[in-house]
């Protein structure tokens, strides 16, 4: 049984009575449908009174040339969700744009904010029919922490209050500049850095990787994001074939790369399985996988070594805590994608710190184009890593961040 006891309330889940442990035969689908462990006879005295959504736009000068986007980004959009109770408490979160939520507010108003499993089921159906509204789940977790007087990492299991970060770059620089950036990450204490491929010819990507390895030696773990799992609407380039991915894997083996991320289209499970069997480099995927059963299939199908769903984009914390545990029961790594904004990074950090054993968590940081000030513009204080690369989470109830109300007012567009 896995849960957190906060006096009279329980946040977590119990396996059904006929499944002795989480590793029993047939545990995977059972775990996906695990029932909530909030005591039904001790309902919260709080009720959801309002849900407010606002949209914000931060101008970017200089532009951010993201490796996964063929268009320079001249602004950064973010959506903020606030869930308030009749007692005046408020949970805040950010992530996806909440498209499709309008008209569904009545499904939550008047309900117990601690009925997280109930709200998760509603959000899952909204996801299927309309759009991804998972920031609401994150806001409900922030609110739950404030109601119960505990930080989210503790509600999720309290495994640790901190998680180590890897520096996640976002731009494509020439080999020398890429090596310079890696040296800066090393000096700042990060244990690992993720480099991006997508220069048109993967051989040019390998040249940049060689320059970095030559500069930092074995002092940094190197991760590679191949950027082949999905495309933006205006990018019609085909994903790599299996033979392309295998050829790249051979180069990454030579350069002692820790993992290769999204080397194939996100739906090519057979290709990922074959690639995983053919290479010593860990295969990572799952950042844009939309449904929990698809993540389950990546795990149980032997397709990945590293699973990377983002709580701000799929499943929320309520859904991904299932996936995090299932991943670990299969002796794989669970370390989320976090490229939304500081609130999204923080939510994923709470999830990992609370219940997952992972070597490091993604920390989007590639100045000057992607600075902490840009990434975390919604927050009064940026989320930082210390001189050894550790993110230490707050003891404050909920997520532990506060919105920058003046900045939100100045950047609001809807």
Task: Name these PLM-found stretches.
Residues 3-4, 10-13:
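Aromatic (phenylalanine/tyrosine) cluster motif
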Residues 33, 38, 43-63, 69, ...:
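Flexible C-terminal active-site loop/helix
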Residues 45, 50-52, 83-148:
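Metal- or metallocofactor-binding catalytic centers and their adjacent structured scaffolds
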Residues 48, 88, 136, 149, ...:
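Conserved, mostly hydrophobic/aromatic
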Residues 110-111, 115-118, 256, 265-284, ...:
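Shared catalytic-loop signature of beta/alpha-barrel
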Residues 162-279:
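Metal-dependent enolase-superfamily TIM-barrel catalytic cores that perform enediolate-based chemistry
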């Amino acid at each position: 049984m896995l849960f957190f006891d906060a006096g009279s309330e329980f946040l977590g889940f119990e396996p059904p009575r006929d499944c002795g442990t989480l590793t029993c035969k047939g545990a995977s689908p059972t775990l996906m449908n695990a029932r909530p462990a909030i005591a039904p006879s001790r309902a919260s005295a709080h009720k959801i009174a309002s849900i407010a959504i606002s949209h914000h736009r931060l101008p970017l000068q200089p532009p951010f040339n993201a490796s996964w986007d063929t268009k320079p980004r001249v602004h950064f959009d973010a959506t903020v969700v606030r869930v308030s109770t009749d007692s005046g408490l408020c949970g805040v979160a950010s992530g996806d744009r909440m498209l499709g939520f309008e008209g569904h507010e009545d499904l939550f108003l008047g309900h117990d904010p601690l009925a997280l499993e109930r709200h998760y089921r509603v959000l899952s159906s909204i996801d299927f029919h309309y759009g991804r509204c998972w920031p609401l789940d994150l806001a409900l977790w922030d609110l739950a922490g404030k109601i119960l007087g505990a930080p989210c990492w503790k509600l999720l299991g309290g495994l640790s209050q901190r998680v180590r970060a890897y520096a996640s770059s976002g731009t494509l620089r020439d080999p020398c500049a890429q090596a310079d950036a890696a040296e800066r990450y090393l000096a700042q204490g990060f244990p690992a850095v993720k480099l991006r491929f997508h220069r048109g010819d993967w051989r040019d990507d390998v040249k940049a990787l060689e320059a970095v390895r030559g500069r930092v030696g074995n002092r940094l773990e190197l991760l590679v994001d191949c950027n082949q799992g999905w495309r933006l609407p205006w990018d019609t380039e085909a994903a790599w074939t299996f033979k392309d991915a295998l050829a790249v894997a051979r180069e990454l083996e030579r350069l002692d790369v820790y993992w290769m991320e999204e080397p194939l289209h996100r739906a090519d499970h057979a290709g990922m399985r074959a690639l995983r069997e053919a290479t010593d480099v860990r295969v990572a995927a799952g950042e844009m996988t939309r449904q929990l059963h698809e993540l389950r299939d990546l795990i149980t199908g032997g397709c990945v070594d590293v699973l990377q769903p983002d709580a701000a984009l799929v499943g929320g914390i309520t859904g991904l805590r299932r996936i995090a545990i299932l991943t670990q029961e299969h002796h794989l790594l669970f370390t989320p994608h976090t490229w939304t904004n500081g609130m999204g990074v923080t939510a994923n950090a709470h999830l990992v710190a609370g219940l997952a054993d992972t070597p490091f968590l993604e920390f989007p940081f590639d100045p000057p184009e992607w600075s902490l000030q840009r990434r975390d513009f919604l927050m009064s204080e940026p989320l930082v890593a210390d001189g050894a690369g550790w993110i230490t989470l707050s003891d404050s109830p909920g997520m532990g961040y506060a919105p920058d109300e003046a900045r939100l007012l100045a950047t609001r567009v809807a």
